[in-house]
Amino acid sequence: MNTTQLATLPTAINSPSNAIWHLGPIPIRAYALCILAGIFICVWWGDKRYRARGGQKDVVLDTALVAVPCGIVGARLYHVITSPDAYFGPEGNLALIPQVWHGGLGIWGGIGAGALAVWLYLRRRKLEVGTFAEAVAPTLLVAQAVGRLGNWFNQELFGAPTTLPWGLRIDAEHLPAGYAPGTLFHPTFLYEALWNLAGAAALVWLGRRFNWHGGVSMWAYMVIYTAGRIWVEYLRIDDAQHILGIRLNVWTSAVVCLIGLTGLFLTLHKQKAFAQVGAGLEEE
């Protein structure tokens, strides 16, 4: 590659110039499209993986129809509770709470509410939760990777300033106070998306290599996602609640990571014990 070719390489990632399109009077928001695309991939791929494990057709779709609305409500409530100034502060506006199309969904509220809805729904239908969890775990990471592109369109939740060639350009209207025009920022949406895609690939490979079952992949998903989320959170500069000088989402991620590690260890240990008992019975 010669000097001229090097000079023509991009030295930054541009933010999209538009995040909203109109179909007549109806606004079509990129943020919503990214979330919907992620949900579609999760349901489509999750259904294939679930049926490959002996599950019934359309169970993943039916479960998603319950879990997604609950997850959106949970995600919004988590955001409102952890970022209260925009809604309850001196200049807050309660009317903004239901306006999710402007952004502001806390992933932990979505995961918690969605997971509870899934568990209750599957229990009601008398379906094996572990098999379902095993099937959808990697698909969640892909869905979250696609959903993160919504932050790119909205020009939000980016990281600290950087001089790296993949720094993110932000329009003047979205530029945080105190930063000069032309400042480049860490594209945390891209970091998290790539981490999640790599994590999904790892889950698929590990599941096949070690014949994971019974929800092992879901525990591993919790560990992989939270490990990535912790280092990404340390890059971000948006306003956030802090506890002992550490962002709330870092604390939440650390707790969920520990739960995932514990669940992963106990589930694998339990399955190993069952396998040893089964081998002993066969020898007899």
Predicted regions and their residues:
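A feature for loop-to-transmembrane-helix boundaries and adjacent hydrophobic helices
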Residues: 1-284
